Curated annotation (Swiss-Prot):
NCBIfam families: rplV_bact. One of its GO terms (cellular component) is cytosolic large ribosomal subunit. This is Large ribosomal subunit protein uL22. Part of the 50S ribosomal subunit. Keywords: Ribonucleoprotein, Ribosomal protein, RNA-binding, rRNA-binding. Belongs to the universal ribosomal protein uL22 family. Signal peptide: none annotated. It comes from Thermomicrobium roseum (strain ATCC 27502 / DSM 5159 / P-2). This protein binds specifically to 23S rRNA; its binding is stimulated by other ribosomal proteins, e.g. L4, L17, and L20. It is important during the early stages of 50S assembly. It makes multiple contacts with different domains of the 23S rRNA in the assembled 50S subunit and ribosome. The globular domain of the protein is located near the polypeptide exit tunnel on the outside of the subunit, while an extended beta-hairpin is found that lines the wall of the exit tunnel in the center of the 70S ribosome.
Length: 118
C-alpha cells in the first residue's frame, strides 16, 4: 500500500532541494529520519516534517506499521517563480527569480523475506 504526502511552494530552489532528497531515496523510514535530523541544509527540516506526515498518514489512515515503511519514491518538482527586482548601475534594474519547489514522497511497506514477487 503506497502512502503519499506532498508539500507545495517551499521557498528553496529545486536544485538545492534535490541534494537533500537524493540522500534519503530508497532508505527505510527510520534511517531517513535519522539522516535528515543531522543534515545542515535548509531543506532538511522541511523534508523531515514531510516524512513524519507521510508516516502518520500511513499509520492512521491505512493501519500500516511505521517500522516496516521505506521511502519508495521522493522527488522535487519546480514550483512557481517569484519575480523580484534588484537595482543596478545607471538607473537600470536586474531581474531576480525566487524559485520554489514542490516535494512529494511516497512510502511503501518493505516486502517480507521469502514472499513471492509479483
Amino acid at each position: 500500500m503506497e502512502v503519499r504526502a506532498m508539500v507545495r511552494e517551499v521557498r528553496v530552489s529545486p536544485q538545492k532541494a534535490r541534494m537533500v532528497i537524493d540522500v534519503i531515496r530508497g532508505k527505510p523510514l527510520r534511517d531517513a529520519l535519522a539522516v535528515l535530523q543531522v543534515l545542515p541544509q535548509k531543506t532538511a527540516p522541511i523534508a523531515l516534517k514531510l516524512l513524519r506526515s507521510a508516516a502518520a498518514n500511513a499509520e492512521h489512515n491505512y493501519d500500516l506499521d511505521p517500522d516496516r515503511l521505506y521511502v519508495k519514491r521522493i522527488y522535487v518538482d519546480e514550483g512557481p517563480r517569484y519575480k523580484r527586482w534588484q537595482p543596478h548601475a545607471r538607473g537600470r534594474v536586474g531581474r531576480k527569480w525566487r524559485r520554489t519547489s514542490h516535494i512529494t514522497v511516497i512510502l511503501d511497506e518493505l516486502p517480507e523475506k521469502g514472499a513471492p514477487r509479483g
